A protein has these predicted regions:
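Acidic-basic catalytic patches of nuclease active cores, encompassing PD-(D/E)XK
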Residues: 1-31
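Short glycine/proline-enriched coil/turn segments at helix->beta-strand junctions
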Residues: 22-25, 41-44, 74-77
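Short, charged, amphipathic alpha-helix that recurs within catalytic cores of restriction-modification
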Residues: 57-80
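Surface-exposed cleft-lining segments at the edges of enzyme active sites
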Residues: 2-3, 52-56
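Beta-rich catalytic cores
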Residues: 35
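Conserved catalytic cores of phosphodiester-cleaving nucleases, focusing on short active-site segments
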Residues: 39-54
């Protein structure tokens, strides 16, 4: 399951790269697989989370606290993109928006072992359709 999830995510990164460059600039590059974010340039960090559900299936969508902390600590403009089955949505990450997120322990159990961590749960109404 883990390998399938990685392949699913990498495919979405490749499929959406042109669209992301057209929105955020031609200098955007795709980062290495072990990087904390999926795309960047000198001034911006972009993380893409691909989901297997529609936008409104759940009231929130989650992302690891570590990713958000990394983005905030970078001093760069930081964007999270959520690729739902029915559309691509975005949110710009800044300290003011974090107050609207809920931080709690979460994770998944469907890949053979528990994967638990601290996650921010972002209310979907804060996301903008692209």
């Amino acid at each position: 399951m883990y390998k399938k999830d990685l392949e699913f995510g990498f495919k979405a990164e490749d499929d959406l790269f042109g669209k992301i460059k057209s929105i955020y600039g031609e200098k955007i590059i795709k980062t290495e697989p072990n990087c904390r974010v999926d795309y960047c340039d000198d001034n911006i960090l972009i993380e893409l989370k691909s989901r297997r559900n529609n936008y409104n299936t759940y009231p929130t969508t989650m992302i690891s606290k570590g990713k958000i902390d990394y983005m905030l600590d970078s001093g760069k403009r930081s964007i999270c993109l959520f690729n739902f089955t029915d559309g691509l949505y975005s949110i710009e990450i800044d300290k003011n928006k974090i107050d609207k997120f809920k931080l709690k322990k979460g994770g998944r159990f469907d890949r053979g072992r528990p994967e638990l961590n601290q996650y921010y749960y972002i209310p979907i109404e804060l996301l903008t359709k692209m």
